[in-house]
Amino acid sequence: MIKEKLRYTKTGKRIESYEFDAKLHQKVVMDKFQFENHILVKHPEITLEIIKKVLEDPDIVTKQSKSKKEHFYQKKINNLNYFVVISQNPSIRKLRFVVTAFMAKDTNFLKEKNKYIRYKTK
């Protein structure tokens, strides 16, 4: 289930968001604005359900380096590779944010960048 939440910044700004559970992280949040104005516009094939599936049951989770905060969740659905990139906000511990989500026919473009495998299905 995808939860709709209201978050408030330190200055009191109200932010509508979606909340997901993820395989390696307790809580992952995506602003509705981010989804509607970035992901849907640039990657119209991505739905909230796809993001949920990729985060909850990924085939593989990688990182570019041990120090980088971004995690690349990957899952193959109907012969298409879906990616959800999440990152940590340094001021909010234990909370990750969706940076982007996209589909790619080939996963080789990530092999050079993402050398550190954090999770892989058996």
What are these regions (language model features)?
Residues M1-K122:
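Ribonuclease/tRNase effector modules and their secretory precursors
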